[in-house]
Regions:
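Short, amphipathic alpha-helical "recognition" segments used to contact nucleic acids or chromatin
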Residues: 4-27
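Helix-boundary capping/turn motifs
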Residues: 20-25, 42-46, 64-69
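General secondary-structure propensity
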Residues: 26-36, 51
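Short, basic interhelical loop/turn and adjoining N-cap
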Residues: 32-46
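DNA major-groove recognition helix of helix-turn-helix
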Residues: 48, 52-55
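Short Lys/Arg-enriched helix C-cap and helix-to-coil transition segments
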Residues: 56-74
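Charged, helical or coil segments that form electrostatic protein-protein
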Residues: 68-86
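Helix-turn-helix/homeodomain-like alpha-helical modules used for DNA recognition
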Residues: 80-123
């Protein structure tokens, strides 16, 4: 499997957000990520799931790479800059994801904790 370039992540975020907002369907977002960004069709689904999870807390997803984790978290917090409740919920969902994977003994998620600590100080 090829490494997904960091340059593709802003568009992954954009399509995931558009699907969440109902501007396009989840399947359209997945196809755009797959076709336009040349990301594996199966993996393309994870970006929407991660975005949705950070906002709603529904269905925790796979852990994406650190750049993606940080980018999505930062952009969601920017989008909700005037909504402290949503920012707190998003950070809580992120923390629960860390705890979920550590609890499943997937291994230490120190890098995720560093990302969490960076943003929790801002809320």
């Amino acid at each position: 499997m090829n490494k997904i370039p960091n340059e593709a992540i802003p568009d992954c975020f954009k399509y995931s957000k558009h699907a969440f907002e109902g501007k396009i369907t989840k399947e359209e977002a997945r196809l755009k990520i797959h076709e336009e960004l040349d990301i594996n069709f199966g993996s393309a689904r994870d970006y929407y799931l991660y975005y949705n999870y950070l906002i709603t807390g529904n269905k925790p997803t796979w852990v994406l790479n650190n750049y993606t984790l940080g980018y999505f978290l930062e952009k969601i917090l920017e989008d909700y800059k005037n909504d402290n409740e949503q920012k707190k919920k998003t950070l809580l969902h992120f923390k629960k994801l860390i705890e979920k994977f550590e609890g499943e003994k997937v291994g230490s998620k120190k890098s995720m904790r560093v990302i969490y600590e960076k943003y929790i100080k801002l809320v």
